[in-house]
Amino acid sequence: MASLKEIDGRIKSTKKMKQITKAMNMVSSSKLRRAEKNTKQFEPYMEKMQDAITAIAGASKNSSHPMLRPRQVQRSGYLVITSDKGLAGAYSSNVLKRLINDIKEKHTSSDEYSIIVLGQSGVDFLKNRGYEIENSLVDVPDQPSFKSIQAIAKHAIDLFSEEHIDELKIYYSHYVSVLENKPTTKQVLPLSREDSSQGQGQMSSYEFEPDKESILSVILPQYVESLIYGTILDAKASEHAARMTAMKNASDNATELIDDLSLQYNRARQAEITQQITEIVGGSAALE
């Protein structure tokens, strides 16, 4: 049985750890609120951009723009969003497992795909397993600006435009609620034209200057960059929620451990006192 000193030391160290996890929970909660706000503020812009894209594409069904034209997939591009820091439960590992499973299922050679990674945990995970990384971005801010991710988003788009890849998919954790995040795969390029007919009626009376193709050549890359940025905002909200939940669970577990250790301490203390009383009584009896 552990001594009173050992048990007391464990209680003190666990209390200190609980203070840390509780503080981290509060910090993550604050970051989550900001991330939710950023995502909500970005949604109206994306909706308007989506309206413009579907309207122009709907009015130009025969568009030859490469971003709207599916082609035979010989090489896939994967943009993977993970965290830079740990202590977020299975946030990154679930996304990476999904990616690895898809690679093993769909590809027989590393020449058939390119991987772009956001987040140090993803870089470390893939490098340790021998996967080649096309490009990476680490130290992504907790509240990323568009400028902070634009370069890597443009690189992913350029790979598609220059036909180094034939499709681009994003692997990330979608924020559902504080208690739920969902590993998700999103097709980014080529863009879907399923909804393009929705804008055709509302834009049929408009004239496009200089012409629809010229407008698409400018607006489509901007739209895809924005789509990637919006996905990163979503993933960041999911990360903060996952870390907040993990720290709350750690704090709750610390509370339970402190209670158990306190019970052990009291029992050990009681046994020690009983032993001391027994020794005193025994000594008194021997003196009589």
From Swiss-Prot:
Keyword vocabulary terms for this entry: ATP synthesis, Cell membrane, CF(1), Hydrogen ion transport, Ion transport, Membrane, Transport
Family annotation (CDD domains): F1-ATPase_gamma
Main location: membrane
Gene Ontology cellular component list: plasma membrane; proton-transporting ATP synthase complex
Membrane-related topology note: Peripheral membrane protein
GO biological process: one example: proton motive force-driven plasma membrane ATP synthesis
Subcellular location: Cell membrane
Coiled coil segments of this chain: none
Any GO molecular function: proton-transporting ATP synthase activity, rotational mechanism
Domain of life: Bacteria
Pfam families assigned: ATP-synt
NCBIfam families to which the protein is assigned, alphabetical: ATPsyn_F1gamma
Subunit annotation: F-type ATPases have 2 components, CF(1) - the catalytic core - and CF(0) - the membrane proton channel. CF(1) has five subunits: alpha(3), beta(3), gamma(1), delta(1), epsilon(1). CF(0) has three main subunits: a, b and c.
Membership in a protein family: Belongs to the ATPase gamma chain family.
Function according to Swiss-Prot or TrEMBL: Produces ATP from ADP in the presence of a proton gradient across the membrane. The gamma chain is believed to be important in regulating ATPase activity and the flow of protons through the CF(0) complex.
Name of the protein this chain belongs to: ATP synthase gamma chain
Lineage of source species: Bacteria, Bacillati, Bacillota, Bacilli, Bacillales
